Every structure is written in C-alpha cells, then in structure tokens.
C-alpha cells in the first residue's frame, strides 16, 4: 500500500530544437568591472568579440583554451614583415571567434597599418544578425 496514488506518466518526446539564448552580465571595460546589467543577443556577442580580441589565449587559467587570441605572438615579432602580419591577422581573429556557436562566419577584413599598430575592420555573421567590428591591434594596444 503506497502513501501516494500511483499515477502513470506518458513519455512525451519533444523533437523541436532548443535554441539557446545568449545572456550574460555586461562588462564595464573602462573600469574593469562586471555590472549587474544582463545583456543578450548582438550586444552579448559583441562583448564576446571584444573580450576575445583583448585576451591573450592561454594567459589566464580562469578561461578555457577556446577564449582569447594569439595575435600578440605575431604582432610583437620584430622579425616578421608587415605584409606577413597583415596576412596572419584575419586567420588569427577568425580562430579566436569561431569557437562560439553563435558565430557562423568572420569576413570582409580590411587592414591598414597605422604607425606601430594595425586598424582592422571586419564583419561577424551570427545567428542574431551581423556585427561590424573595428579595432586597433598592436604590440602596445
């Protein structure tokens, strides 16, 4: 004799695809603080792109090896030419970003040498829409 009634449950399989939303806390990069504000969609992806471009891969144990980039290895190498650096920058940026499932492609690179730095603009195609990114990359940036 059970204390509760026996109820038969019917197993229902849901074949619909679960869509994960991108939701994260906003980072105040000027003050180096995480805020209470929750961001989603393109704004969350844009923050991921910024974080990936400004974090050296393997430098921080708090991040997995999928986070960050290896741009500094190329940009700080005084023995490589600017032409080689311009050739490598798109590959290294794409490798830094493509680990994120929300990002489908990184395209339309434009790279311009400015003093010791490179002004880089490119397009990030995501499942939320398209982002136009412009960054200045360099050894001391």
UniProtKB/Swiss-Prot annotation:
Protein name: Uncharacterized protein YqbS
Highest taxon listed in the record's lineage: Bacteria
InterPro entries linked: DUF2634 (IPR020288)
Entries under Pfam families matching the protein: DUF2634
Protein family: To B.subtilis XkdS.
